[in-house]
């Protein structure tokens, strides 16, 4: 099976394979295959719309983890200019699972921070599969405080299975690092916009997710635990993950209905990995619009709005 397609996309993969086969013989002038290719492309689009129009929560969770899905650095390349990455937490080390730095969104200087997974094996290991250690969150905190000092808005991109649960992270006080970020972000006197671009996993996501405006991409997820983890606790088997995903309400539309998410950003047909540039353009438009809205608030009004927003959860 084509690795760019998940199992529920197999009918689409089959059609795409037929289209590629026809293209390979396209140089044979004795065959007029242009019309047939167009017909199959239309059929593929219709089939994709049908499949993606009725995705389950579990299928969306799998799309959120798609190995070809754009990551934070991909979006930074498409959305911002003059990005200058900053490193280190000034306490222990630099954590590659969190990237951040100053950049420009159009003409506005901003601080951009996000989780970063890896593509190849070595990069996955170097970035710890997008699971930050305490030094990653402390680096993020340092950059956010710098942004406040220089009056720069903060834009975060969330994409992590969760904070790293290893013994070394616990020895360096993982829970304190996350809690400290929550405290600091709640009080920062600068606009904060968070966007979930893939997996929003528990406290590992929340540690850069306290904000004035929360966006989720259409096929992203946000939850206190993975569906597999929830299923293992409740049903003693990860095979019940699809049931857990449905019960947990992890999708953007469900969370928008609960008032947790402010905006669901549409993705290209088939997911952001099918057209990263188009996905980035949609995010850029929302960030620009939301930033213009938030800049109308003075510091006191901004903090009150943020506090009221947080206190409304669960009501």
UniProtKB/Swiss-Prot annotation:
InterPro entries: Acetyl_CoA_COase_a_su (IPR001095), ClpP/crotonase-like_dom_sf (IPR029045), COA_CT_C (IPR011763). It comes from Pseudomonas fluorescens (strain Pf0-1). Belongs to the AccA family. GO terms for molecular function: acetyl-CoA carboxylase activity; ATP binding; carboxyl- or carbamoyltransferase activity. One of its GO terms (cellular component) is acetyl-CoA carboxylase complex. Pfam families: ACCA. Keywords: ATP-binding, Cytoplasm, Fatty acid biosynthesis, Fatty acid metabolism, Lipid biosynthesis, Lipid metabolism, Nucleotide-binding, Transferase. This is Acetyl-coenzyme A carboxylase carboxyl transferase subunit alpha. It is found in: Cytoplasm. It catalyses: N(6)-carboxybiotinyl-L-lysyl-[protein] + acetyl-CoA = N(6)-biotinyl-L-lysyl-[protein] + malonyl-CoA. Its EC number is 2.1.3.15. Acetyl-CoA carboxylase is a heterohexamer composed of biotin carboxyl carrier protein (AccB), biotin carboxylase (AccC) and two subunits each of ACCase subunit alpha (AccA) and ACCase subunit beta (AccD). GO terms for biological process: fatty acid biosynthetic process; malonyl-CoA biosynthetic process. Component of the acetyl coenzyme A carboxylase (ACC) complex. First, biotin carboxylase catalyzes the carboxylation of biotin on its carrier protein (BCCP) and then the CO(2) group is transferred by the carboxyltransferase to acetyl-CoA to form malonyl-CoA. Its main location: cytoplasm. Residues 40-293 form the CoA carboxyltransferase C-terminal domain. Pathway: Lipid metabolism; malonyl-CoA biosynthesis; malonyl-CoA from acetyl-CoA: step 1/1.
């Amino acid at each position: 099976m084509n690795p760019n397609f998940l199992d529920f996309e197999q009918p689409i993969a089959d059609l795409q394979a037929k289209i590629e086969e026809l293209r390979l013989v396209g140089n044979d002038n004795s065959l007029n295959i242009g019309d047939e290719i167009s017909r199959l492309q239309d059929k593929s689009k219709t089939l994709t719309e049908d499949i993606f129009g009725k995705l389950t929560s579990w299928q969306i969770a799998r799309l959120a983890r798609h190995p070809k899905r754009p990551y934070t650095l991909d979006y930074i390349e498409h959305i911002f200019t003059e990005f200058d990455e900053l490193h280190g937490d000034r306490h222990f080390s630099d954590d590659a699972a969190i990237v951040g730095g100053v950049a420009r969104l159009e003409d506005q200087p901003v601080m951009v921070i996000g989780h970063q997974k890896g593509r190849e094996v070595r990069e996955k290991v170097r970035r710890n599969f997008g699971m930050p250690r305490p030094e990653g969150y402390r680096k993020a905190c340092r950059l956010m405080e710098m942004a406040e000092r220089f009056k720069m808005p903060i834009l975060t991109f969330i994409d992590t299975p969760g904070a790293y649960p290893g013994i070394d992270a616990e020895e360096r006080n993982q829970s304190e690092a996350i809690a400290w970020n929550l405290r600091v972000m709640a009080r920062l006197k600068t606009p904060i916009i968070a966007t979930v671009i893939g997996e929003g996993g528990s406290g590992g996501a929340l540690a850069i997710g306290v904000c004035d405006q929360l966006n989720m991409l259409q096929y992203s997820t946000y939850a206190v635990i993975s569906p597999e983890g929830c299923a293992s606790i409740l049903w003693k088997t990860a095979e019940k993950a699809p049931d857990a995903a449905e019960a947990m309400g992890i999708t953007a539309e469900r969370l928008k209905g609960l008032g947790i998410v402010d905006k669901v950003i549409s993705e290209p047909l088939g997911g952001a990995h099918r057209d990263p540039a188009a996905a980035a353009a949609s995010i850029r438009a929302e960030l620009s619009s939301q930033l213009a809205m938030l800049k109308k608030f003075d510091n006191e009004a901004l903090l009150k709005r943020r506090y009221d927003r947080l206190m409304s959860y669960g009501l």
